[in-house]
């Protein structure tokens, strides 16, 4: 897909805020409800288009799409594909965010972004999977939305914090 040319009025559709944290994510506790984008995305995208929005950043929820290593959740793959088709129908360019706030619990168990080996091995697989699933339907990518905020979870451990910042910069 080719992005539109010229200025754009854009918006953000955050996976965490729209859907709530995934049960398979690193966010502990009871999943919080989202804002109903799950079932009303077509209406929401139509409204955005009517308001003149021509581009959005849409967060991919890694923990929803890949709740276990090597396993893709087909229901979530289909849901994201439908959102992308809806955006295209409404003339909205989509830029996918590969990481916004949360990661799968299994990636967190491996050390998450504070572990160079886990990041170097598992992050590229996620990037390749996302590109394979959705690459032909998007205008561009945001690899890491907030690397400094992501690394802040290790602020209590200066070594891990530094490692996370480096690994996030490389990712």
Model-derived regions, located:
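A short, mixed-charge helix-start or loop-turn motif at secondary-structure junctions
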Residues: 26-30, 65-66, 112, 158
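Aromatic-lined substrate-binding rim segments of carbohydrate-active enzymes
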Residues: 45-102, 168
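Active-site region of glycoside hydrolase catalytic domains
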Residues: 1-19, 81-85, 89-171
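Glycine-rich anion/phosphate-binding loops
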Residues: 31-42, 70-82, 114-129
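N-terminal carbohydrate-binding accessory modules
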Residues: 1-53
């Amino acid at each position: 897909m080719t992005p539109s040319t010229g200025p754009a009025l854009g918006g953000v559709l955050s996976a965490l805020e729209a859907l709530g944290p995934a049960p398979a994510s690193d966010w502990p506790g009871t999943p919080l409800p989202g804002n109903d984008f799950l079932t009303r995305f077509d209406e929401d995208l139509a409204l955005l288009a009517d308001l003149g929005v021509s581009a959005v950043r849409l967060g991919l929820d890694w923990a929803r799409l890949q709740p276990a290593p090597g396993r893709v959740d087909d229901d979530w793959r289909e849901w994201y594909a439908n959102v992308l088709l809806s955006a295209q129908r409404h003339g909205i360019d989509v830029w996918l965010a590969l990481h916004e706030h949360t990661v799968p619990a299994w990636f967190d168990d491996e050390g998450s972004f504070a572990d160079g080996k886990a990041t170097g091995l598992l992050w590229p697989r996620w990037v390749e999977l996302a590109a394979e699933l959705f690459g032909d339907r998007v205008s561009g990518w945001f690899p890491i939305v907030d690397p400094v905020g992501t690394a802040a979870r290790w602020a209590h451990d200066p070594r891990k914090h530094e490692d996370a910042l480096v690994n996030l910069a490389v990712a």
